[in-house]
């Protein structure tokens, strides 16, 4: 039983360890350099997959701040090569940065901070109005329903979440919830 694979296995190159497994008439030769390369590729794929999951989570977190509800899930990373994972990680890093930038710079941020200055504290939990922009329960349920269900009233939301809920309200009904303060803060 002299085959080319068996002859290569007997010769044993420098730095190679061979393991043979014979089944009937087939001989399989595996070298340590092959398994080391596969291990390195597996480690690289795991590294980039971790980064992609982290960037996706950051992107989802910032989109949740802006939209008031979580966004849908993403597809699996299993079918990508290491090079493809590296490119995908770069794409998700850019998406996360863009989502962070947009979420932390809502429209009229200076004016919303001005309204907060005159209306109340970000953690104001008194009476019929909650939060720094003084939102009542019907306002919170209409424009921040997911946040109200999952985090409670507006005094438990972050200032950015409160501002984005107010931005959604301003898009649909203007600045009527803050008539005097919005005018004095230059929003009319």
What do the predicted segments below correspond to?
Residues 100-188:
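Peptidoglycan cell-wall recognition and remodeling modules
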